[in-house]
Design a protein with these regions (language model features):
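Short beta-strand segments
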Residues: 111, 137-143, 168, 289-292
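Conserved beta-ketoacyl condensing-enzyme motif
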Residues: 4, 50-113, 220-238, 244
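Short, well-ordered amphipathic alpha-helical segments that serve as non-catalytic structural scaffolds
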Residues: 51-67, 202-218, 270-275
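Flexible, glycine-rich active-site loops centered on histidine and acidic residues
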Residues: 130-162
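Condensing-enzyme catalytic core mediating Claisen C-C bond formation in acyl metabolism
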Residues: 1-50, 151-213, 302-307
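Acyl-CoA/ACP chain-elongation machinery
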Residues: 141, 187-189, 235
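Claisen-condensing/thiolase-fold acyl-transfer catalytic domains that form or cleave C-C bonds
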Residues: 84-90, 103, 111-133, 227-307
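A short glycine/serine-rich beta->alpha loop
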Residues: 41-48, 81-82, 106-111, 150-153, ...
């Protein structure tokens, strides 16, 4: 049973208010007000002089569980929202492996589930490790806002920079994965769809369905779920979803939305770290990690863990 061994995160110190992004993102004053007052997106983190490699290395530097165990790493996975995250031929994951002495590991990117790819990467890592005994996988997430598409989800969210690093093993006592559900919806194609608004109309019901699917697979009622760790798209989306499924919004960890924005696939790990730091999870607690990603189709994903 896949388990999280250790999680670390990194957020740049540079804070950029939403208002300061209006010019480059071509936002009207009304759109800025909508993001701040309605979606509760106040600022994002940026590191203008840093590279993606810098972001990932900073997260790994905080991963105490890796030190002295580099030889146990079998796989290094980079969960990406976008298939292309750096200009060719730059390869930050291979560079990271060289720097950290992980050249022996199989390193590759996981993508095409957009912002839900972080959950896919955990699942892939666990499946690979099932054949590797006591080996570990290093799952990385985080991207640079180096294109306009990587800065803004129109009318919905603003991307921020940051990164996470997670050690995964096939089985273990800490944060055991009980269930994973992923619903891939190819009809929600933002370029080829005859009805571009269909994704927005069905977003809440689709995300609710996958959360309930994962909970059912884990034989867990929502009343037994201590916490939901969301993707940080905005606050109002989760308020609506909670009303739909009858789950208390107070048990959805949304504190990082106003101060970090939507940090690509790293949201779940940032929120996990916050939950640990604040003592929101006790041994035996069950929690759900949920995310949705859109682009060439859409993916709605949820995982149930036991802390």
């Amino acid at each position: 049973m896949t388990a999280l061994e250790s999680v670390a995160t990194y957020l740049p110190s540079g804070r950029v208010p939403i208002e300061d992004l209006a010019g480059q993102l071509e936002l009207t004053p009304m759109q800025v007000k909508l993001f701040r007052r309605y979606h509760r997106l106040a600022e994002v983190r940026r590191e203008p002089d840093g590279t993606l490699l810098d972001l990932l290395l900073a997260a790994v530097a905080n991963l105490d569980g890796l030190r002295g165990r580099e030889h146990e790493i079998r796989y290094v996975l980079h969960a990406r929202t976008f298939p292309v995250v750096v200009p060719y031929p730059v390869n930050p994951v291979h560079a990271l492996c060289r720097i950290l002495g992980l050249d022996h590991a199989v390193a590759f990117a996981v993508t095409h589930h957009a912002c839900a790819t972080g959950l896919l990467a955990l699942d892939v890592a666990g499946r690979l490790l099932a054949h590797d005994g006591d080996g570990l996988a290093l799952v990385l997430a985080g991207e640079k806002t180096f294109t306009r598409d990587a800065q803004l989800v129109p009318e919905t969210s603003v991307f921020g920079e940051g990164a996470s690093a997670c050690l995964v093993r096939h089985a273990g006592p800490r944060d055991r994965l009980l269930a994973y559900a992923a619903h891939v919806r190819g009809e929600f194609d933002d370029e080829l769809s005859d009805d571009p608004s269909a994704y927005q109309r069905e977003y809440h019901s689709s995300l609710a369905d996958v959360i309930l699917d994962a909970a059912a697979q884990a034989h867990t009622g929502l009343g037994e779920v201590q916490l939901i760790l969301p993707h940080n798209v905005n606050v109002v989306a989760w308020q609506r979803l909670c009303r739909r499924i009858g789950y208390p919004i107070s048990q959805v960890l949304l504190d990082n939305v106003p101060v970090a924005g939507h940090v690509f696939c790293a949201d779940a790990f940032l929120n996990y770290q916050t939950a640990r730091e604040r003592g929101l999870l006790r041994p035996g607690d069950r929690y759900i990690v949920a995310a949705a990603g859109a682009g060439r189709g859409a993916t709605f994903s949820a995982m149930v863990f036991e802390h």
